């Protein structure tokens, strides 16, 4: 396992910080749940349904949501664009240390990482084009990590600078 590296994003927050465990009205799409991570491909991650809100602990900031923890068992996590009709704008306090986690697709509304870290079991992470700075995120095991993003984006530049495999979407 290789050492860690650090990254972060400029973000915004809300005013009302109500801590919640999500009670999702969504049904977990059984076809989207993958149990054998040895069979997962990057295309599986790209085509995977959003992870149900019930799999996350989050803070309601009033006009937005910050994800605190992932409690699901699916090795693929697709951060939802919204929870309870509010944009998911940040990941805080290292919620992605779940040992079953292999693949993460970050939502396009995501603006901030606050001391977030990803376990050494993570194999693929999709960084949307809007991500332009990673300063407060730690990846462990980056020698086995693949960053997926737009060609010519910050994600590609970052991957090359850090010696991480990059795949254009």
Segments predicted by a language model, with ranges:
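C-terminal motif of bacterial Sec signal peptides marking the signal peptidase cleavage site
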Residues: 8-11
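N-terminal, intrinsically disordered, polar/charged segments of Gram-positive cell-envelope systems
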Residues: 16-55
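A short beta-strand segment in extracellular, disulfide-stabilized domains
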Residues: 91-93
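Structural signature of tandem-repeat unit edges
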Residues: 55-63, 72-89, 99-112, 119-133, ...
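Sec-dependent N-terminal signal peptides
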Residues: 1-4
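Short loop/helix-cap segments at secondary-structure boundaries that form the rim of catalytic
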Residues: 119, 139-140, 156-161
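Conserved functional micro-motifs across diverse proteins
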Residues: 66-68
């Amino acid at each position: 396992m290789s050492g860690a590296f650090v990254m972060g994003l400029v973000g915004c927050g809300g005013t009302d910080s109500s801590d919640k465990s999500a009670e999702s009205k969504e049904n977990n799409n059984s076809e989207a749940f993958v149990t054998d991570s040895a069979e997962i491909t990057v295309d599986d991650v790209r085509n995977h349904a959003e992870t149900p809100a019930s799999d996350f602990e989050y803070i309601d900031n009033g006009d937005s949501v910050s994800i605190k923890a992932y409690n699901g068992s699916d090795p693929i996590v697709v951060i939802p664009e919204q929870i309870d009709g509010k944009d998911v704008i940040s990941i805080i306090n290292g919620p992605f240390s779940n040992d079953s986690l292999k693949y993460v697709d970050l939502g396009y509304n995501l603006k901030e990482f606050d001391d977030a870290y990803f376990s050494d079991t993570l194999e693929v992470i999709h960084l949307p084009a809007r991500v332009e700075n990673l300063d407060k995120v730690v990846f462990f095991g980056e020698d086995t990590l693949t960053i997926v993003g737009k060609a010519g984006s910050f994600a590609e530049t970052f991957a090359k600078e850090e010696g991480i495999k990059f795949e254009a979407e």
